[in-house]
């Protein structure tokens, strides 16, 4: 199984007291079959940029620019034209279902469908019924 790791799963690993189950799940993954979206990098970077200066901010900035990018090196998927088309369809489907879907979540979901990846996320309810194969590391 090839996976796209959602931002909330990545963020869990950087918390001072992460959920043990999620950390164990992450450590058991076959790294070659795991990808992240450039959108997740943007979301995490925004969070770091909004933090007050200090050790925690410095540590997270280092984790993002050094550890995370090195770990996923050639496995960061950009938003390209195919993802953009899938995003438009996904957002329209969500709207027809009467559901709001955040743009960034939509881009991550579109990345998963475009690249035939299972989306590992805590927010499975946001994507239910939208044709995205889901896995919840907190529950599975």
Residue ranges and their predicted role:
Residues 1, 107-140:
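Acidic, PIN/NYN-like endoribonuclease modules and their adjacent C-terminal/linker elements
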Residues 42, 83-85, 140:
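A short acidic, often aromatic-flanked loop/helix-cap motif at beta-alpha or helix-coil junctions
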Residues 1-40, 49-66, 125, 140:
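Short, well-structured N-terminal submotif of metal-dependent ribonuclease cores
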Residues 31-33, 73, 116, 131:
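A generic structural signal for alpha->beta connector loops
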Residues 21, 43, 86, 129-130:
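Phosphate- and divalent-cation-binding pockets in alpha/beta enzyme and binding domains
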Residues 8, 21, 82, 106-107, ...:
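Active-site phosphate/pyrophosphate-handling residues
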Residues 46-54, 70-119:
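Active-site neighborhoods of divalent-metal-dependent phosphate/nucleic-acid chemistry enzymes
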Residues 35, 77, 135:
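General small-molecule cofactor/ligand-binding pocket signal
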